[in-house]
Amino acid sequence: MTHIPVLLKEMLLQLSPHSGGIYVDATFGAGGYSKAILESADCKVYAVDRDETVTKFYDDLNVKYPNRIKLFIEKFSNIKNLLDSNNIKGINGIVFDVGVSSMQLDNGDRGFSFLRDGPLNMSMDNYSHMNASTFVNALREEEIANTIYNYGGERHSRRIARAIVNARKKKIIKTTFELADIVRSVVFRGKSKIDPATRTFQAIRIWVNDELGELEKGIKAASEILSENGKLIVVTFHSLEDRIVKTVFKDLCEPGSTKTFSLLNKKVIKASSEEINVNPRARSAKLRAIQRLS
C-alpha cells in the first residue's frame, strides 16, 4: 500500500508556506507533507521522525531539493531541545500527522498489523524496552483490560484480557496472528465489518509508543518554538488524539497565556467525500490549526 498523505490540500492552505520560510514536519514518515511544502514555496524544511527506516524517503527528497531539507531521527516530544541544540530558529510553521503509517502497517516484521504475521513488536523506533510482547506476556490482567478499554474503546476488554492471560499460561504469545486469534476466540464479529482484533491492536500500539503522552508533549513543545505569526497544524485519526489537541489548543488560546495564540478555524477540518473515496483512511482524519500572535 502506497502511503497517501491525508488532508494535504487543507494542510497547505492553513500553513501557507512562503519563500524563505522555515518549516518543521514533525512526523516525516514517507515525506508526503515535506514534499508538498517544498514544492509549494522556495523554503526550508526540518523533518523529524522517531523511525530510522524513513531515511530512504528523506534521501530521495534531499536529492531533489538539495540544501532545503534536513532529517533528524528523534521523538517529536523532544522537538524543542532538538531545534535549540542545532540553533534552528525563526520557525514559521510546524505540522504533525500523527499515528501509525501505512509503511509500518505493511511491514509484518514490525508487528503492527493483525493482517500480517510477525513478531509482537509495534515499536515505532525499535529502541523501546517496551513492546507488544511485553504487554501481552508480562502485564497483569487488570492492566491489560484497562489499557485495551481506555486506549481502544473495547467494551470486551476484560474478556480479552482473561483470554490473553489464559493463553500465555500455556505458552508465550509470540506473533501477531497468535494474538489476533486469541482476541477473535472471545469477541465475535457478527455483522460488523471491523475485525474483532482492531481495537486491541490499536490500544497496544498506543501503549507501546506512549502515543498520547508524546502528542501532548510534542504540541506543547512546538508551541514554544514558533515565531510570531507561526502556525501549528495537527492531523489526528481517533478521538483520544483529537481530544488532546483540542484541549491543548484551547489552553494556548486562553487570554493571559505566556504566548498568545488564536484558532485558525473554529470548527475542525475533515476530509471531503472525494478524498475519502480515493483514500478511505482519511475518513477519521481531523485537522486543527492555531497561529501564534505574539
From Swiss-Prot:
GO terms for biological process: rRNA base methylation. NCBIfam families: 16S rRNA (cytosine(1402)-N(4))-methyltransferase RsmH. Its main location: cytoplasm. S-adenosyl-L-methionine binds at residues 31-33, 49, 76, 97, 104. Belongs to the methyltransferase superfamily. RsmH family. Its EC number is 2.1.1.199. Specifically methylates the N4 position of cytidine in position 1402 (C1402) of 16S rRNA. GO terms for cellular component: cytoplasm. SUPFAM superfamilies: Putative methyltransferase TM0872, insert domain (SSF81799), S-adenosyl-L-methionine-dependent methyltransferases (SSF53335). It catalyses: cytidine(1402) in 16S rRNA + S-adenosyl-L-methionine = N(4)-methylcytidine(1402) in 16S rRNA + S-adenosyl-L-homocysteine + H(+). HAMAP family: 16SrRNA_methyltr_H. It is found in: Cytoplasm. This is Ribosomal RNA small subunit methyltransferase H. InterPro entries: RsmH (IPR002903), SAM-dep_MeTrfase_MraW_recog (IPR023397), SAM-dependent_MTases_sf (IPR029063). One of its GO terms (molecular function) is rRNA (cytosine-N4-)-methyltransferase activity. Pfam families: Methyltransf_5 (PF01795). It comes from Wolbachia pipientis subsp. Culex pipiens (strain wPip). Keywords: Cytoplasm, Methyltransferase, rRNA processing, S-adenosyl-L-methionine, Transferase.
